[in-house]
Amino acid sequence: MTMNNPYFEVINEEIKAVVENKGDVLETRDSAMDAEVQSEQVEGFIDEKVDCILINAVDWKAIGSSLKKAKKAGIPVIAVDTLVYDQSLVDGIVVSDNYEAGAQCAKDLMKRKKKGKILFLVQSENKSAIDRIKGFKETLEKAGWNYENIGDIECKGQLEVSQPLVENVLTKTKDIDVVVALNDPSAMGAMAALDAEHMLSDVLVYGADGSPEAKTMIYKNRMMATAAQSPRITGKKTVEMLYKILAGKPVESQYIVPVRLITRDNVEDYSLSGWQ
């Protein structure tokens, strides 16, 4: 989606290391969260007649028209870290267990509070983000946990977008118990806004990624938890699938990368300086 998120930098590094070691070339394009730009980039790869396209869809539905062109051109496609709406258009999928990521955060919250007012930071065009928030909400609802939804704020998963949006919410109400963010960058933006209002110690903030920055905030007791993904495993499994497809070997249609919840209770078991 954007290399502005270090998570995707790590995935790219893992893939690039293997590709270059084999004497091949990895061309990386950053769509900067623009679905139209991403579609143009895919079509550019089709024109170049590349051997395979790895896609992290900005908009899981809008990318379909470009993927149809790739399929018609006979170019295999692997969806990386997020699903596309029409899965028949891709040859393989490597994705984290995003629903479980949200569910794990919800289960942790239920251990700590009996009810609460929750602000959600969302990204409705991205399936991974959709599934995380869905997993969180449905887990609470199935358990009968009482919560008030303060709002679903569209933030593109970006720190620089989420911070002013949360600042704006705080001008209208400071009655917030929990912030649930689709990823760690948006959680960091929320925490910056809360900290400016001296509210961070009173609000439980949940994210997803397991970034070094989030783990450090958890260690400092300033963030509650992050559902940790593994960009290293995602990158390795993607490139493994890539070369199997190019060799004409069978691959499992979807590889699910497990997630682990990192909280104040277990953060010391993880490296604060690196990724999983």
Predicted segments with their positions:
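Extracytoplasmic "Venus flytrap"
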Residues: 1-18, 22, 27-44, 48-50, ...
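Short beta-strand elements in bilobed, periplasmic/extracellular small-molecule ligand-binding domains
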Residues: 19-31, 117-122, 140-159
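Structural recognition of the beta-strand scaffold that forms the well-ordered cores
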Residues: 27-29, 54-56, 76-81, 95, ...
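Hydrophobic alpha-helical segments within soluble ligand-binding/sensing domains
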Residues: 38, 94-118, 130-131, 159-163, ...
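Hydrophobic alpha-helical
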Residues: 46, 55-70, 136, 151, ...
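Flexible loop/hinge segments that line or gate small-molecule binding clefts
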Residues: 56, 60-100, 111, 117, ...
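Short, solvent-exposed amphipathic alpha-helices that sit
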Residues: 7-24, 101-105, 128-146, 161, ...
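Hinge/cleft segment of the Venus flytrap/periplasmic-binding protein
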Residues: 138-143, 230-276
